[in-house]
Amino acid sequence: MALSKKRFIIAAVLMIIITAAAVLISFMSAPYLVMYVSDTNTRYITQKAEDGLMFSVEFIHSVNQTPVKDTYIIENEQIRAYSTTYRSFGAGVQTALDDGQTMTYDDDGNMVITGFDITYNPLRYIVGTVSDHILTIDDKEISLRDLCGRNAKVVFEITTPFEILTKGLL
């Protein structure tokens, strides 16, 4: 009788360990969108990378000195270019449409190009020294200059909690 009880306890403990391991593996492999500074590995944003999640980065273009807004969408654990919005043609901005792209105008008269077939992982920006880069995610506007500093090398990446730990992202 004592042997049977001991086997039952061992079996129960093993089941708990196996269940905990399965939950941990599931959690550790779930995709997350992270934003960090590559020079310091300081992580500022960690958000579940669910399909349809959108974010944008808006800045003043360094050459033509007008606002540009790049919008991205998460699809199939990838960061995909969704649209680019800008006010005027000029050096450094797209002047012709590629196959599958369309251009419309928003309510403010800005040009909006959609239909991109470009994915990034990682997506990189260098925060401006003169003008800021504004991240919009979950209807929140975040100054990347205030958050990360001027000239910060910002990286957006789809990764897992396990990879976050192994890369040393603080």
PLM feature spans:
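Short, Lys/Arg-rich N-terminal segment immediately upstream of the first membrane anchor
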Residues: 1-7
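Hydrophobic membrane-insertion alpha-helices, especially the h-region
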Residues: 10-27
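Aromatic-capped interface at the extracytoplasmic side
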Residues: 22-39
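Short extracytoplasmic/periplasmic juxtamembrane "stem" segments immediately C-terminal to an N-terminal membrane anchor
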Residues: 36-54
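Short, structured patches in soluble enzyme cores that scaffold and shape functional sites
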Residues: 37-39, 59-61, 158-160
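Extracytoplasmic/periplasmic/luminal assembly and interaction segments
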Residues: 56-96
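Mature, soluble, non-transmembrane domains
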Residues: 93-170
